[in-house]
């Protein structure tokens, strides 16, 4: 019997903290461990779509926007439509996005049960995948709320800088509100420090302060994603870090992150997590 699919939102309202890089490379790493992975690009900028070497996304006939539009109008989404939306990148599948998703987000405000449109959209896909990763847009708008409602858990990429860490409070408040009002099973898998230059005291001090502030209530992954020129090249060449720099430290870090994500899921199946966010 197939294990339950886990939906993970990769979220932070601050841009440039490694959300898309984490989504793609964590997805590839999980697939390398035998998981069947689907990535959803829920950002109208289509950063994840472009990173996955999908050229001219604005010319695509079926994207996440069209699938959500069908859900909003109550029309049936047949498997032909869904299959036309799904693209292949290395060892993972992706449902791409383009600028039309901006219009979809606006339309959500006039939709019944607007916070759960994405959840209903991806429900038919859960039986086909082990993991669904949602690359969230850099805002706390309606699309990000939809991602949090659709998700089982959240991973929060965070750069070791004062402004990035300071902005976590607003995101954590939004997650707590979604958990309290709509999605009581939503959990935080952890805060992931990205683009870490371990040579600098500043990065070490900020990471240490974050761990102290979170205490035992919110996990801060021991794994950190190092700053790397090779990693920044990946979107330009349309490759994951496992293809572009397979023996580098970033590939090793994402491989270890994938192991920890699977370990968290196994622990959750053994014992219940504490109720609520503290």
Give the residues covered by each predicted segment.
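P-loop NTP-binding core
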Residues: 1-278
């Amino acid at each position: 019997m197939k294990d339950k699919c886990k939906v993970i939102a990769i979220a932070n309202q601050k841009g440039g903290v490694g959300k898309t890089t984490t989504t793609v490379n964590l997805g590839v790493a999980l697939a390398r461990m035998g998981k069947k992975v689907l990535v959803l690009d829920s950002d109208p900028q289509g950063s994840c779509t472009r990173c996955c070497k999908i050229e001219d996304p604005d010319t695509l006939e079926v994207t996440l926007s069209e699938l959500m539009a069908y859900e909003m109008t109550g029309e049936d989404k047949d498997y032909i439509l869904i299959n036309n939306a799904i693209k292949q990148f290395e060892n993972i599948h992706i449902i791409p996005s383009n600028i039309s998703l901006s219009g979809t987000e606006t339309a959500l405000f006039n939709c019944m049960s607007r916070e759960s449109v994405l959840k209903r959209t991806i429900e038919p896909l859960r039986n086909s995948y082990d993991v669904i990763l949602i690359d969230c847009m850099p805002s706390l708008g309606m699309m990000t709320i939809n991602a949090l409602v659709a998700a089982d858990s959240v991973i929060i990429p965070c750069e070791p800088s004062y402004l990035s860490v300071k902005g976590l409070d607003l995101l954590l408040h939004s997650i707590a509100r979604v958990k309290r009002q709509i999605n009581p099973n939503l959990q935080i898998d952890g805060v992931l420090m990205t683009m870490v230059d371990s040579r600098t005291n500043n990065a070490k001090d900020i990471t240490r302060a974050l761990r102290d502030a979170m205490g035992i209530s919110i996990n801060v992954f021991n794994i950190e994603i190092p700053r790397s020129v090779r990693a920044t090249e990946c979107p330009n060449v349309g490759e994951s870090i496992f293809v572009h720099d397979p023996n580098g430290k970033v590939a090793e870090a994402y491989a270890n992150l994938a192991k920890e994500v699977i370990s968290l899921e196994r622990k959750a199946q053994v014992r219940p997590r504490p109720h609520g966010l503290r």
